[in-house]
C-alpha cells in the first residue's frame, strides 16, 4: 500500500511536467502569430496607402464614365438606331406587299401556280406568289439583256469580217448586187441564238452548252 501511494504522487508529478511542456509548445505556436502580428502593423501602415488609393480612384472614375456615357448617349443612341433600321426594313416589306395587290405580273397566275406546285412550293397568300413572279420576270429580263449584248458583240465581229470580204469583191454586178441589197436589209435585225443565251446564263451558273462528243 505504501508503494502504491508512493507511485501515485510520482505519476501526478510527471503529468504536470508534461503539461507545461505541451503548454510551452502551445505558447511557442501562439507567439509566432503574435510576432507576425507585431510585424504586420508596420506593413499595414504602408499597405493601406497603396491599396486604398486605386480603390478611391476606381470609385471616382466609375461615375465619370457613367456620366460620359449619359452625355454621349451611347446607351440610348446606338441601340435605337439598330431597332429603327430593322423596323424600317419590315415597314418597306409590308408596303411593298401591299402594292402587290394592284400589280399584275407578266407571268400568268396559272403558269406561276403550275411551276410552284411542280417545285413543291405551297403558299396561300397571292401577294407572295406575285412577288415570286416579279422576281422571275426580273431574272428573265436580265438574262435577255445579257444575251442581247452577246448578240451585238457577235454581229459586230461578223459585220467587220463581211465588210473586209465585200471590199475585196467590190465591182461584181448582176445577181450579186441584188443579194447584197437583201442582206443589207437584214443587218438591222438582231437574232438571239442558243450560243448567246448559254453565254448569258453561264454568268448565273447555268450551263446550257452541249457536252462534248467523243468517238
Swiss-Prot record:
Residues 23-42 have a biased composition (Polar residues). Transmembrane segments: none annotated. GO terms for molecular function: promoter-specific chromatin binding; RNA polymerase II general transcription initiation factor activity. Residues 1-77 are annotated as: Disordered. It comes from the Eukaryota. Residues 58-73 have a biased composition (Basic and acidic residues). The gene is taf10. Belongs to the TAF10 family. Component of the 1.8 MDa SAGA (Spt-Ada-Gcn5 acetyltransferase) complex, which is composed of 19 subunits tra1, spt7, taf5, ngg1/ada3, sgf73, spt20, spt8, taf12, taf6, hfi1/ada1, ubp8, gcn5, ada2, spt3, sgf29, taf10, taf9, sgf11 and sus1. It is found in: Nucleus. It holds the Pfam family TAF10. The keyword 4Fe-4S does not apply. One of its GO terms (biological process) is positive regulation of DNA-templated transcription. Keywords: Nucleus, Transcription, Transcription regulation. Residues 58-203 form the Histone-fold domain. Functions as a component of both the DNA-binding general transcription initiation factor complex TFIID and the transcription coactivator SAGA complex. Binding of TFIID to a promoter (with or without TATA element) is the initial step in pre-initiation complex (PIC) formation. GO terms for cellular component: cytosol; nucleus; SAGA complex; transcription factor TFIID complex. The histone-fold domain (HFD) mediates heterodimerization with TFIID-specific components TAF47 and TAF65 as well as SAGA-specific component SPT7. This is SAGA complex/transcription factor TFIID complex subunit Taf10.
